[in-house]
Each structure stands twice: as structure tokens, then as C-alpha cells.
Amino acid sequence: MFKKVTGVLFFCLALTQCSETTDLMNRPIHKTDNAFQNEEHRLLPMDGAHNTRELGGYKTNDGKSVKWGMLFRSDKLSDISKADQQYLQNLGINKIIDFRSKEEKAEDPNIIPKGISYVEMPISVDGAMRSKIEAVLKGETNKEVKSFLIDANKEFVSDYSGVYEEFLRNLIDEDGPTLFHCTAGKDRAGFAAAITLIALGVSKENVIQDYMKTNQFTQERIEEIIDQIELMSLYQADAEILRPLLGVEREYIETAFKTAEEKFGSLENFIREGLNISDKDIQKLRNKYLES
């Protein structure tokens, strides 16, 4: 029973509804139309993805702003519609970076629109997640599900600095818009967005606020997944205990920040020393992605 429920959970996490419901002509192009350069339009209207959003508009500590239409974070793109594909092309996206593991990509291969380059940077922090969740559902462990994601955020700093260095170097070298994603668009992609914004000079609090927007943008989907898990288990499983896995908590990203700060003294030093991104590199990044 619990293996079945665990399977249902991962199926639901991977599931997206793909029906062309959003008129392509009415989708916002932030870069060329300042009417869309606001919080109301930060989440992109996608038929086959739930957490695709803009990183433009965030203010930096020196009074500049992140350019609209240059940086996008997302969940997986394996179920996007033809209209979604055209939309990504209309946004001018040059490159898609995928943080998913080999197994995740085999289960749900990305749909890459024509003319957009695709780069794989696998981060496999979820390899043992299924068995851990099954143990929680069975009551065999008192360890909270949220502790799994706390540990994962520590690993982003301790075990995957090389991947995140490669990610930032791709942004530095890329001249056009980039979209980066994982499966749910919240943990691996969330940390990538966080270090990018920190490197650009956005305050830690504003970075955390962007991280937390996942809960706002995916709330309806989270409720659907919880209802589905309870239904498939004939209400024998308490799906509520899995809620921390489906969204984000401030503690997750703060754990990553604390891990970096304890080892390197500050997030800025983590980027310089832990990710080997020099001050010259940071200036190049800012020249590309910031405006006055």
C-alpha cells in the first residue's frame, strides 16, 4: 500500500496539465513591454508548467534593478504545449539549464523548443527520497519530511558547488535570456536563483521572498496532490505530513545560507571562494543582468 502511495506522490510531483488554455498572443513579454514589468506578471502563464517565473525587477543594494526578460526559473518542461514552446521562443530564451538527475530526465524528457540550446547540470539529491517518504508514511521513523529538504540544502553548498559554479559561469558567458529548472522548480532551481540574485547584489531578505513565492504560485496544485494521495491510499495515509516536501519553507534556504556563511564567512565569500567566481566575474554578471 505505502509503496503504491509513494509512487503516486512522485507521479503527482511529475504530473502537469497540458492543455492549450492561454492565448499565445496575450502572454506577457516582459523585456519589450513595461506594462508587464510588475509582480502581477512575475508568474508566466504556461499550459504545461506550474512554477515558471521571471527574476526581473528585483532591486539591488546599490539602487539598480535586475533586467526583465533575461533570467527565468521553472519547474520541468516535459509537458509543455506547442503554445508554451512558441512562448519560450517569443521570450527570446537562448539556453535552458536542467538540474534534474539522469533518472528524472529519463522519466520525463524535456521538450526543448527549436533554436534553444540545452545544458544538463544534474544534481541528484533526491536519490533516497522514495524510501524515506515510504518510511514516514509507515510510521517507521519520526524524522520529519522537512528534514530531508534541510539536508538537501546543506548539500547544495557542501557537495554541489562545482555544479553551481558551472551554472554561474554559463550566465556570465551567455549573451541572451536563460531559463533554468529542476522538477518542481523550487529546491535546486531555488538555490540557483538565490545565489544568482545574491551575486547581483539583491538583499538576502528579497532573495528569500522570491524563494517563498513557490508556495503562492503552486498552492492550488499542492492541494490537488494531497487530495490525490489520500484518495489513492483509501485515506489510510496522512498526506499532510508530506506537505513540507511539496512546497518551500524559509528554513530550507536559510539552512543553505547558514551552511555557506559558517564555512566562508558570508554569502558573497561563498560565491567568490566556494564557487570560484572572481570580483571581475561578478562585475561581468552585473553588467549583463542589471540596469540603472
Model-predicted segments: where are they?
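Bacterial N-terminal signal peptides that target proteins for export
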Residues: M1-T6
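Cys-dependent protein tyrosine phosphatase-like superfamily
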Residues: C18-T178, A192-S292
